[in-house]
Amino acid sequence: MTKQHAFTREDLLRCSRGELFGPGNAQLPAPNMLMVDRITHISDEGGKFGKGELVAELDINPDLWFFACHFEGDPVMPGCLGLDAMWQLVGFYLGWQGNPGRGRALGSGEVKFFGQVLPTAKKVTYNIHIKRVLKGKLNLAIADGSVSVDGREIYTAEGLRVGVFTSTENF
């Protein structure tokens, strides 16, 4: 079976309902926490480390929910949502590779914010570079990522860690 290398918004919504990788396996969050509109490229080769990469996008418009509350009179997308989007994509990668279980963000190394997403922006682009995938009792991916707005890099994160668990009872 050939792997799909791009995913539409509808595909991602299917993933949020648990329909893309099967019951009990990796899911994306549902809207409003789903911070990705499409994955334009996913591969288990390439990227900075030669172990895989993802490129995904989020369309920005002034009506997005977070602009109304963060901050009143000074709307900006919370940086933590961009960080969460990168974790979402690393978890998606594990599911796409066929690793069973539910995804959980496990941490990251250094995170830097040096720009912002305003309601006047058009598009956020996420770039994820897989560093390592560990398979065993716990299937874990480690990646570096960046967030760009309208072509300008504004956040970076090193050592993004996501695991998939067949049971989250004792997590």
UniProtKB/Swiss-Prot annotation:
Residues annotated as catalytic: H70
EC number: 4.2.1.59, 5.3.3.14
SUPFAM superfamilies tied to this protein: Thioesterase/thiol ester dehydrase-isomerase
Protease is among the record's keywords: no
Reactions this protein catalyses: a (3R)-hydroxyacyl-[ACP] = a (2E)-enoyl-[ACP] + H2O; (3R)-hydroxydecanoyl-[ACP] = (2E)-decenoyl-[ACP] + H2O; (2E)-decenoyl-[ACP] = (3Z)-decenoyl-[ACP]
Source organism, top-level taxon: Bacteria
GO terms under cellular component: cytoplasm
Subcellular location: Cytoplasm
Record key words, sorted: Cytoplasm, Fatty acid biosynthesis, Fatty acid metabolism, Isomerase, Lipid biosynthesis, Lipid metabolism, Lyase
One BP term from GO: unsaturated fatty acid biosynthetic process
Iron found in the keyword field: no
Biological pathway: Lipid metabolism; fatty acid biosynthesis
InterPro entries referenced in this protein's UniProt entry, alphabetically: FabA (IPR010083), FabA_FabZ (IPR013114), HotDog_dom_sf (IPR029069)
GO molecular function terms listed in the Swiss-Prot or TrEMBL record: (3R)-hydroxyacyl-[acyl-carrier-protein] dehydratase activity; trans-2-decenoyl-acyl-carrier-protein isomerase activity
UniProt similarity note: Belongs to the thioester dehydratase family. FabA subfamily.
Quaternary state and interactors: Homodimer.
PANTHER family: 3-HYDROXYACYL-[ACYL-CARRIER-PROTEIN] DEHYDRATASE, 3-HYDROXYDECANOYL-[ACYL-CARRIER-PROTEIN] DEHYDRATASE
Protein name (Swiss-Prot/TrEMBL): 3-hydroxydecanoyl-[acyl-carrier-protein] dehydratase
Lineage, highest ranks first: Bacteria, Pseudomonadati, Pseudomonadota, Gammaproteobacteria, Pseudomonadales
